[in-house]
């Protein structure tokens, strides 16, 4: 389910871009929420690996790094589904002993995107607002 807060009736390019960025931030905050839940269970996440789709654009990669507060590693692969199939095929064909080994052999980091310190407090405030809106939306649906 999604909640959109503050949506106006403006239809100019600036408002459309702002809505797009807000949507991407929502995806980033949702990912951050998952990472936080994993951390509470003892699973430490050091970085996010991204490839394919919208994740190919540098703006999306940087925004995810900023909203999650973790480095985003962009791979050289433009077709991650095919790469995944090749990795599994390498293991099945005994070319690699394990999926982990095949991943190390077939994947390579192309670029790194680090969280920008000057946006840290902004995204922390918005992340807290995101969680509050999420709780409010849950109450409304009950």
Give a label for each model feature.
Residues 1-142:
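Glycine/Thr-rich phosphate-binding loops that ligate phosphate moieties of nucleotide
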